[in-house]
Protein backbone atom coordinates (compact mmCIF):
# COMPACT_ATOMS: atom_id res chain seq x y z
CA UNK A 1 0.00 0.00 0.00
CA UNK A 2 1.40 3.39 -1.01
CA UNK A 3 2.05 5.83 1.81
CA UNK A 4 -0.14 8.92 1.89
CA UNK A 5 -3.57 10.22 2.80
CA UNK A 6 -6.65 8.29 1.64
CA UNK A 7 -9.96 10.18 1.42
CA UNK A 8 -12.56 7.45 1.77
CA UNK A 9 -16.27 7.68 1.00
CA UNK A 10 -18.67 5.72 3.20
CA UNK A 11 -22.40 4.88 2.84
CA UNK A 12 -25.02 7.59 3.39
CA UNK A 13 -27.65 5.11 4.56
CA UNK A 14 -27.35 1.72 2.90
CA UNK A 15 -24.36 -0.34 4.05
CA UNK A 16 -24.46 -2.25 0.76
CA UNK A 17 -23.05 0.88 -0.88
CA UNK A 18 -19.70 0.39 0.89
CA UNK A 19 -17.17 -0.43 -1.84
CA UNK A 20 -14.76 -3.38 -1.58
CA UNK A 21 -11.86 -0.96 -2.15
CA UNK A 22 -13.00 1.25 0.74
CA UNK A 23 -13.09 -1.77 3.05
CA UNK A 24 -9.64 -2.90 1.90
CA UNK A 25 -8.11 0.55 2.41
CA UNK A 26 -9.65 1.04 5.85
CA UNK A 27 -8.48 -2.41 6.95
CA UNK A 28 -4.90 -1.80 5.85
CA UNK A 29 -3.99 1.83 6.60
CA UNK A 30 -2.02 2.58 9.76
CA UNK A 31 -4.55 5.06 11.14
CA UNK A 32 -8.10 6.28 10.47
CA UNK A 33 -9.10 9.90 11.15
CA UNK A 34 -12.85 9.73 11.75
CA UNK A 35 -15.32 12.58 12.18
CA UNK A 36 -16.89 10.66 15.09
CA UNK A 37 -15.14 7.51 16.24
CA UNK A 38 -18.37 6.19 17.80
CA UNK A 39 -20.32 6.52 14.56
CA UNK A 40 -17.47 4.99 12.57
CA UNK A 41 -17.20 2.22 15.17
CA UNK A 42 -20.54 0.79 14.01
CA UNK A 43 -19.35 0.72 10.40
CA UNK A 44 -16.02 -0.75 11.45
CA UNK A 45 -17.71 -3.54 13.41
CA UNK A 46 -19.91 -4.44 10.44
CA UNK A 47 -16.97 -4.70 8.04
CA UNK A 48 -14.41 -6.09 10.49
CA UNK A 49 -12.20 -2.99 10.36
CA UNK A 50 -9.86 -3.08 13.36
CA UNK A 51 -7.52 -0.24 12.41
CA UNK A 52 -6.65 2.28 15.13
CA UNK A 53 -8.67 5.50 14.85
CA UNK A 54 -8.61 9.07 16.11
CA UNK A 55 -11.23 11.83 16.07
CA UNK A 56 -10.86 14.57 13.48
CA UNK A 57 -13.77 17.00 13.29
CA UNK A 58 -14.45 20.72 12.90
CA UNK A 59 -13.88 21.41 16.60
CA UNK A 60 -10.44 19.80 16.89
CA UNK A 61 -8.97 19.93 13.36
CA UNK A 62 -6.54 22.72 14.21
CA UNK A 63 -4.97 20.55 16.90
CA UNK A 64 -5.23 17.17 15.18
CA UNK A 65 -4.22 18.02 11.59
CA UNK A 66 -0.57 18.97 12.38
CA UNK A 67 -0.09 15.67 14.21
CA UNK A 68 -1.59 13.73 11.31
CA UNK A 69 0.61 15.58 8.82
CA UNK A 70 3.69 14.69 10.87
CA UNK A 71 2.68 11.03 10.80
CA UNK A 72 2.11 11.18 7.05
CA UNK A 73 5.50 12.81 6.49
CA UNK A 74 7.06 9.96 8.47
CA UNK A 75 5.64 7.46 5.98
CA UNK A 76 2.42 6.37 7.69
CA UNK A 77 -0.78 5.68 5.76
CA UNK A 78 -3.81 7.57 7.03
CA UNK A 79 -7.45 7.40 5.92
CA UNK A 80 -9.97 10.16 6.60
CA UNK A 81 -13.70 9.39 6.84
CA UNK A 82 -16.78 11.41 7.74
CA UNK A 83 -19.91 10.09 9.43
CA UNK A 84 -21.48 9.49 6.01
CA UNK A 85 -20.58 10.23 2.41
CA UNK A 86 -17.42 11.92 1.16
CA UNK A 87 -15.16 13.80 3.58
CA UNK A 88 -14.87 17.47 2.70
CA UNK A 89 -18.37 17.79 1.21
CA UNK A 90 -20.09 19.78 3.99
CA UNK A 91 -18.10 17.55 6.34
CA UNK A 92 -14.61 17.70 7.89
CA UNK A 93 -11.70 16.65 5.72
CA UNK A 94 -10.76 19.45 3.36
CA UNK A 95 -8.35 21.08 5.85
CA UNK A 96 -6.44 17.83 6.22
CA UNK A 97 -6.32 17.36 2.44
CA UNK A 98 -5.16 20.96 1.96
CA UNK A 99 -2.45 20.58 4.60
CA UNK A 100 -1.24 17.35 2.99
CA UNK A 101 -1.06 19.01 -0.42
CA UNK A 102 0.89 21.95 0.99
CA UNK A 103 3.70 19.70 2.25
CA UNK A 104 3.74 17.34 -0.72
CA UNK A 105 2.08 14.33 0.91
CA UNK A 106 0.36 12.12 -1.72
CA UNK A 107 -3.45 12.18 -1.53
CA UNK A 108 -5.66 9.43 -2.94
CA UNK A 109 -9.44 9.27 -3.21
CA UNK A 110 -11.64 6.23 -2.66
CA UNK A 111 -14.97 7.49 -4.06
CA UNK A 112 -18.26 6.88 -2.33
CA UNK A 113 -21.84 8.16 -2.19
CA UNK A 114 -22.56 11.90 -2.03
CA UNK A 115 -26.05 12.96 -0.93
CA UNK A 116 -25.91 16.21 -2.92
CA UNK A 117 -25.21 14.47 -6.23
CA UNK A 118 -27.71 11.70 -5.52
CA UNK A 119 -30.38 14.31 -4.76
CA UNK A 120 -29.55 16.19 -7.95
CA UNK A 121 -29.94 13.07 -10.07
CA UNK A 122 -33.23 12.13 -8.36
CA UNK A 123 -34.69 15.61 -8.91
CA UNK A 124 -34.71 15.34 -12.69
CA UNK A 125 -33.51 18.94 -12.95
CA UNK A 126 -30.72 19.90 -15.39
CA UNK A 127 -27.30 18.61 -14.35
CA UNK A 128 -25.09 20.34 -16.93
CA UNK A 129 -24.50 23.27 -14.53
CA UNK A 130 -25.22 23.33 -10.82
CA UNK A 131 -24.06 25.04 -7.63
CA UNK A 132 -23.82 23.24 -4.28
CA UNK A 133 -24.35 25.72 -1.44
CA UNK A 134 -24.01 23.31 1.50
CA UNK A 135 -26.40 23.81 4.40
CA UNK A 136 -29.08 26.31 3.48
CA UNK A 137 -28.81 29.81 4.94
CA UNK A 138 -32.16 31.57 4.63
CA UNK A 139 -30.45 34.97 4.95
CA UNK A 140 -28.56 34.27 1.70
CA UNK A 141 -31.53 32.89 -0.19
CA UNK A 142 -32.23 36.13 -2.07
CA UNK A 143 -28.62 36.25 -3.31
CA UNK A 144 -28.72 32.55 -4.15
CA UNK A 145 -31.76 33.19 -6.34
CA UNK A 146 -29.48 35.18 -8.66
CA UNK A 147 -27.85 31.87 -9.61
CA UNK A 148 -29.59 30.99 -12.89
CA UNK A 149 -28.84 27.26 -12.93
CA UNK A 150 -29.66 24.34 -10.61
CA UNK A 151 -28.88 24.84 -6.91
CA UNK A 152 -28.37 22.12 -4.28
CA UNK A 153 -28.70 22.50 -0.52
CA UNK A 154 -28.65 20.35 2.59
CA UNK A 155 -31.43 21.18 5.06
CA UNK A 156 -32.69 20.18 8.50
CA UNK A 157 -36.17 18.65 8.92
CA UNK A 158 -36.75 21.13 11.74
CA UNK A 159 -36.39 24.07 9.33
CA UNK A 160 -37.69 22.72 6.05
CA UNK A 161 -41.22 24.18 6.25
CA UNK A 162 -39.85 27.66 7.03
CA UNK A 163 -37.46 27.22 4.12
CA UNK A 164 -40.29 26.31 1.74
CA UNK A 165 -42.22 29.40 2.88
CA UNK A 166 -39.15 31.59 2.28
CA UNK A 167 -38.68 30.09 -1.18
CA UNK A 168 -42.34 30.77 -1.96
CA UNK A 169 -41.67 34.45 -1.27
CA UNK A 170 -38.26 34.77 -2.90
CA UNK A 171 -38.25 32.27 -5.77
CA UNK A 172 -41.90 31.36 -6.42
CA UNK A 173 -41.32 30.63 -10.11
CA UNK A 174 -38.65 27.97 -9.52
CA UNK A 175 -39.58 24.35 -8.92
CA UNK A 176 -37.91 22.62 -6.01
CA UNK A 177 -37.29 18.98 -5.15
CA UNK A 178 -37.15 17.79 -1.57
CA UNK A 179 -35.28 14.50 -1.43
CA UNK A 180 -35.22 12.66 1.87
CA UNK A 181 -33.64 9.54 3.34
CA UNK A 182 -31.54 8.80 0.26
CA UNK A 183 -30.70 5.06 -0.08
CA UNK A 184 -32.78 4.27 3.02
CA UNK A 185 -36.12 2.46 3.36
CA UNK A 186 -38.20 5.65 3.34
CA UNK A 187 -36.44 7.36 0.43
CA UNK A 188 -38.80 9.88 -1.15
CA UNK A 189 -38.67 12.73 -3.67
CA UNK A 190 -41.29 15.52 -3.56
CA UNK A 191 -41.33 18.00 -6.45
CA UNK A 192 -43.35 21.16 -7.00
CA UNK A 193 -43.42 24.93 -6.80
CA UNK A 194 -42.72 26.22 -3.27
CA UNK A 195 -46.30 27.46 -2.81
CA UNK A 196 -47.60 23.99 -3.71
CA UNK A 197 -45.39 22.34 -1.09
CA UNK A 198 -46.31 24.60 1.82
CA UNK A 199 -49.13 22.24 2.85
CA UNK A 200 -47.23 18.95 2.72
CA UNK A 201 -46.60 16.86 5.81
CA UNK A 202 -43.22 18.05 7.11
CA UNK A 203 -40.67 15.56 5.76
CA UNK A 204 -38.44 13.78 8.25
CA UNK A 205 -34.90 12.51 8.03
CA UNK A 206 -31.85 13.65 6.09
CA UNK A 207 -32.88 16.19 3.45
CA UNK A 208 -31.46 17.45 0.16
CA UNK A 209 -33.23 20.41 -1.44
CA UNK A 210 -32.69 20.96 -5.16
CA UNK A 211 -33.83 24.16 -6.89
CA UNK A 212 -34.56 24.11 -10.61
CA UNK A 213 -32.98 26.70 -12.94
CA UNK A 214 -34.71 30.05 -13.27
CA UNK A 215 -37.30 30.02 -16.07
CA UNK A 216 -35.93 31.41 -19.31
CA UNK A 217 -39.27 32.81 -20.50
CA UNK A 218 -40.64 36.11 -19.29
CA UNK A 219 -43.61 36.00 -16.95
CA UNK A 220 -47.09 37.08 -18.00
CA UNK A 221 -48.43 40.51 -17.03
CA UNK A 222 -50.65 38.86 -14.42
CA UNK A 223 -47.70 37.02 -12.87
CA UNK A 224 -45.62 40.20 -12.81
CA UNK A 225 -48.50 42.11 -11.18
CA UNK A 226 -48.65 39.46 -8.47
CA UNK A 227 -44.96 39.95 -7.71
CA UNK A 228 -45.43 43.73 -7.75
CA UNK A 229 -48.12 43.39 -5.08
CA UNK A 230 -45.81 41.19 -3.05
CA UNK A 231 -42.86 43.61 -2.98
CA UNK A 232 -44.54 47.01 -3.35
CA UNK A 233 -44.00 47.77 0.33
CA UNK A 234 -40.20 47.71 -0.02
CA UNK A 235 -38.01 50.61 -1.17
CA UNK A 236 -38.25 51.50 -4.86
CA UNK A 237 -34.61 50.62 -5.63
CA UNK A 238 -34.62 47.22 -3.97
CA UNK A 239 -38.15 46.50 -5.19
CA UNK A 240 -37.18 47.22 -8.80
CA UNK A 241 -34.10 45.01 -8.56
CA UNK A 242 -36.16 42.23 -6.98
CA UNK A 243 -38.90 42.47 -9.61
CA UNK A 244 -36.39 42.55 -12.49
CA UNK A 245 -34.62 39.45 -11.21
CA UNK A 246 -37.76 37.44 -10.46
CA UNK A 247 -39.72 38.39 -13.57
CA UNK A 248 -36.85 38.30 -16.07
CA UNK A 249 -37.36 41.90 -17.20
CA UNK A 250 -35.07 44.92 -17.31
CA UNK A 251 -34.73 47.23 -14.31
CA UNK A 252 -36.16 50.04 -16.45
CA UNK A 253 -39.27 47.99 -17.12
CA UNK A 254 -39.44 47.05 -13.44
CA UNK A 255 -39.37 50.71 -12.37
CA UNK A 256 -42.15 51.43 -14.88
CA UNK A 257 -44.31 48.64 -13.49
CA UNK A 258 -43.80 49.79 -9.92
CA UNK A 259 -44.61 53.39 -10.80
CA UNK A 260 -47.78 52.23 -12.53
CA UNK A 261 -48.70 50.29 -9.42
CA UNK A 262 -48.06 53.36 -7.29
CA UNK A 263 -50.33 55.42 -9.54
CA UNK A 264 -53.14 52.90 -9.12
CA UNK A 265 -52.90 53.24 -5.35
CA UNK A 266 -53.05 57.06 -5.35
PLM segments and residue spans:
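Glycine-rich, flexible N-terminal cofactor/catalytic loop recognition
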Residues: 1-58
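A contiguous loop/helix-start segment that scaffolds small-molecule binding in enzyme catalytic cores
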Residues: 2, 76, 150, 154-266
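Short active-site oxyanion
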Residues: 26-32, 104-107, 150-151
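General beta-strand structural signal in soluble alpha/beta enzymes
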Residues: 34, 109-112, 153, 178
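Alpha-helix capping/helix-boundary segments
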Residues: 38-40, 86, 115, 159
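Conserved helicase motor
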Residues: 56-62, 136-137
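Ordered, amphipathic secondary-structure segments that act as subunit-interaction surfaces
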Residues: 74-85, 89-92
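Class I SAM-dependent methyltransferase SAM-binding "motif I" and its flanking Rossmann-like core
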Residues: 95-147
